[in-house]
């Protein structure tokens, strides 16, 4: 029984199952919401152009404690902020992605958050 629990826990944390680790796309738009929640923070963006134009795209980030360690705060991203986020997209084409080894541009300021790197 403990073997099956380990397998489930391992699968939960496998980004490779949900996201394409090879492909990277840029999501550009305005922040709708920045969710500072465990186990991972998320930012939701109304997409301005490209394949997801007019849709809200969800981006998975690191944990609140990891982001805070890197200087982030729960108020870093505000609704209406212009962002460009490089993400590893969903394997099934859903409007969701993972920000790992990504570049984040907030209102024209480029940053490469250390905490989101492999």
Report residues per predicted region.
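Short boundary/loop segments of OB/S1/cold-shock single-stranded nucleic-acid-binding domains
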Residues: 9-25
